[in-house]
């Protein structure tokens, strides 16, 4: 709902879909652990794609890391050292990305990274700035789940509310963009 809270009626509808035999998989910019816990407590499919596609959680201690935290940390250190007001955002621990407060000019950071040949991607989810490995996005992460579970594009409905959801929309037959 924009405040980080779960809309209980929406969760109830997702649980009903799960009970009807559909896979309901959370794909988020938040940590995959947060999404996995939501799946457990919410009664949906216990698979989660987090960190904007960089991490897949399928069990309590089973994580597939698609991104490289070391490269993202190097990029953060460079940005922090050269641009004022760069701050880490207090979030649940990440395994593949760095999350920053939206307190600086993102385009300035992009230029700095290009000038220093650091191959990472910056994105703005409107919640935070994210530093991810190249090619890592929600669509890429979810496509790995599609391969694993033999899910066809025609069987995917994606729901999102951020520019970071566009890559997920591209792997789905049907997409719903919410106007939060």
Question: Model features per residue range: what roles?
Answer:
Residues 54-55, 129, 176:
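Glycine-centered loop/turn positions within well-structured domains
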Residues 1-4, 164:
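Short, glycine/acidic-enriched loop or turn micro-motifs at the edges of active sites
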Residues 19-25, 44-46, 97, 154-156, ...:
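Short active-site oxyanion
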Residues 3-4, 28, 102, 135:
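Short loop or secondary-structure boundary microenvironments that flank
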Residues 4-92, 180:
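Active-site phosphate-binding/coordination module
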Residues 76-172, 180:
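Conserved acidic, metal-coordinating active-site core of Asp-based
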């Amino acid at each position: 709902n924009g405040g980080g809270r779960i809309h209980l009626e929406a969760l109830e509808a997702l649980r009903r879909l799960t009970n009807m035999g559909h896979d309901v998989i959370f794909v988020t910019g938040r940590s995959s652990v947060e999404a996995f816990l939501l799946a457990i407590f919410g009664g949906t499919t216990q698979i989660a794609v987090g960190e904007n596609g960089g991490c897949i959680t399928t069990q309590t201690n089973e994580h597939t890391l698609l991104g490289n935290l070391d490269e993202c940390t190097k990029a953060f250190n460079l940005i922090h050292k050269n641009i004022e007001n760069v701050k880490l955002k207090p979030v649940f621990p990440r395994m593949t990305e760095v999350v920053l407060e939206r307190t600086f000019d993102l385009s300035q950071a992009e230029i700095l990274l290009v000038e220093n040949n650091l191959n990472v991607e910056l994105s703005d989810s409107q919640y935070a700035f994210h530093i991810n490995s190249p090619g890592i996005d929600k669509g890429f992460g979810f496509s790995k789940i599609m391969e694993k579970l033999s899910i066809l594009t025609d069987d995917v409905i994606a729901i999102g509310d951020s520019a970071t959801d566009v890559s997920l929309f591209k792997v789905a037959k049907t997409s719903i963009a919410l106007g939060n």
